[in-house]
Amino acid sequence: MPDNPTGTLPEIILASASPRRRQILSEMGFIFSVCPSQAELYPDGSVAPAEFAVLNAQIKARDIASKYSNGLIIAADTIVVDDFGILGKPSSKKVALNYLSRLGGKPHTVISSVCLLNTENGQIRSATCQSTLTMRPYTQAEAQRYVDSGLPMDKAGAYGIQDKEFNPVENIQGCYLNVVGLPACTLVRLINEMGFNPKLARNWKPEGDCTLCRIYRTEISRLR
């Protein structure tokens, strides 16, 4: 672990415009500013999905690093992967409907990569988290109504597990917050590896089954 006697966190900058990531960080008790990165790779099949997510998160972190002399940048990238490849954010309603048709009633994987960059010394850490989900067999009409609502348009795979009205997910194995877009345990582990000791909000409790996670019990509970 890097030498850091106080473990005091520098200014935290979230390199994402995602309201879900902002909500997770806020509920965990972090004080941070937001500077969305505009940098992004597009999948071309040249690298494995997990590596693609890592590269995208790192590019986002480096994209805004020059704006801060002493900050801890948090960047993340979430992708959905089915048997045919990577599904990012849909570029149109037609694409969103196609994604939902591909996923309906079938299993797929959600990968989130988190990248932390300390702008003071250039230290960088990345890690990925994966969850396996099975979608319920929704109808084409249900999918069309969901697309028409506009909710899927800013989400990888064209759905949000937290969108209760559509309620697309039948089963999840793995981290719930990973599917939302920012796995809390992965984030805390990376912050700790960089020599910082975050103090989380005492009343914070992750959504889904995260409280059953071994890492949550041993790492996050220890840092309260």
From Swiss-Prot:
The active site is at D77 (proton acceptor). GO terms for biological process: nucleotide metabolic process. It is found in: Cytoplasm. Pfam families: Maf. CDD domains: Maf. It catalyses: dTTP + H2O = dTMP + diphosphate + H(+); UTP + H2O = UMP + diphosphate + H(+). GO terms for cellular component: cytoplasm. The keyword Transport does not apply. Its cofactor is a divalent metal cation. Its EC number is 3.6.1.9. Nucleoside triphosphate pyrophosphatase that hydrolyzes dTTP and UTP. May have a dual role in cell division arrest and in preventing the incorporation of modified nucleotides into cellular nucleic acids. This is dTTP/UTP pyrophosphatase. The lineage of its organism: Bacteria, Bacillati, Chloroflexota, Dehalococcoidia, Dehalococcoidales.
